[in-house]
Amino acid sequence: RASAAGEVGKIKMENGEDIFSPAREEEVLANVLEAHSKYPNALDVNTVRAVFREIMSGSRALQKLLKVTYLGPEYSYSHLAAIERFGQAVEFVPVGSITAVFEEVNRGHADFGVVPVENSTDGRIADTLDMFMRMPQMIICSEIRLQIHHNLMAKCEAKDIRRVYSKPQAISQCRNWLGKNTPHALLTEVSSTTTAAELAQREPGAAAVASRQAAVRYGLRILFEDIQDSADNETRFAVIGHQKTAKTGNDKTTLMFRIPHSPGSLADAIAVFKSNKVNLAWIESFPSRIAKNEYIFFADFEGHIDDPKISKMLKAFNDECTEVTVLGSYPIAQISG
């Protein structure tokens, strides 16, 4: 396989084709999982996915070592999402903000970036939507849906915890549990779950809410697992870059659009999806930076920009809007983690 991957890489380079092909990788994985389903006593599905993720990652690296930037530091949930999508055989570059992720990709310092878009508990990630407004040339070429598992970790015993560190979103997602189980601890917000784990490592009486991987990295003991208030806590991430993704037949498209500031304009725009029998999966409004009291809308719908049905729908949709930007079409991700 390694030899074949190297030859494929040469052909791709000669033809100017993309090394990272989400559509092709989804096709390979779907075939593997279909074959796997025929063996009832085989490995767990998540194990099979992880193994083939690394095989594809290693094969990609033989063609070109990709550079992927993410909202750090190491072992943040953005890092875990990046590993889930690209495997370990890439050069990961942590940066300090979502803005920096976009800038690194835009300047060509990284091939791809991984940014959070939406959490099932806390909703949209405003910084990410804001950067799409600032850099609409960025293309979403893949998505990752990561099940978020928050854990309470420390070097001390649970009864000795006086302070709990984590990022604001993690504290928010575990607030009820923390209130019941660590009522005397001071909840302290920091920049990331990894920073929280680092502080818990060196500060007596401190604990952190973070991932299992962060506990291993900083030598902390997990006192309680899965402490998030919602069992279905999930974050959706976007992979941004400069390349478009081919259709797979199981895709979604993300739009950014502006509508006239008049009664019924949003209803008229949304009606286009219904009349063309296109499933609208997500819509979010965001204050415009151009005009006061005007909003930019983001939307996900099922289908690919290259589908004739979608092309027809977008023509009608454009007629109802003052501006439409297609941020990308990409395979619909299955939840992992």
Can you annotate each of these PLM segments?
Residues 1-337:
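Domain-level signature for soluble enzymes in the chorismate/prephenate branch of the shikimate pathway
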